[in-house]
Design a protein with these regions (language model features):
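Conserved mixed alpha/beta core segments that line enzyme active sites in large multi-domain catalysts
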Residues: 1-159
């Protein structure tokens, strides 16, 4: 009835469900936006990460998360010579002796994996706007002594 009232076609409505396992003993968690939030039409992924299980999206008062912008080469690959990682802020929750939430190799791996996902979403959805302005919003976890990266969920980013 509500859809009919607002003129929404029943056949145009989609619904999904996301199920994943619980992640015990998270070493880190974070969010990636696959577009440059600070310079439209420029390359760059914005990564916000936090040590442990503390929320990145709604952190407790006085908690700062690590924020990184990853710039990549013309192929959107972190494997080229022109990759740059720029730290905008560091977590204030790091234990002594730890300099950052994410290691460089984790940033490279995360960026490599997410670049592939972004290209597939962009092509499959038939997006007409510029590739660099198309964003996905991804959540990730780093778990275990070997620091395995899990992509928890992916959805289109809404400005």
């Amino acid at each position: 009835m509500e859809r009919e009232f607002f003129g929404i076609e029943q056949a145009s409505v989609g619904m999904g469900i996301l199920c994943h396992r619980n992640f015990d003993n998270e070493l880190a968690n974070g969010v990636v936006i696959t577009k440059n939030l600070y310079r439209p039409d420029y390359r760059g992924f914005v990564i916000n990460a936090q040590y442990g299980e503390t929320s990145v999206v709604i952190p407790p008062d006085s908690v700062l998360c690590e924020q990184v912008i990853c710039y990549s080469d013309k192929n959107d690959s972190f494997l080229g010579n022109k990759s740059i990682v720029e730290y905008l802020s560091y977590s204030n929750m790091l234990p002594k002796g730890m300099n950052s939430v994410l290691r460089d190799d984790e940033i490279v791996q995360l960026t490599r994996d997410i670049s592939v996902i972004k290209q597939r979403f962009y092509q499959r959805k038939g997006i007409t706007g510029p590739y660099y302005d198309y964003g996905l919003d991804l959540e990730f976890k780093i778990v275990g002594t070997n620091r395995t990266i899990y992509l928890k969920q992916i959805r289109p980013f809404n400005d």
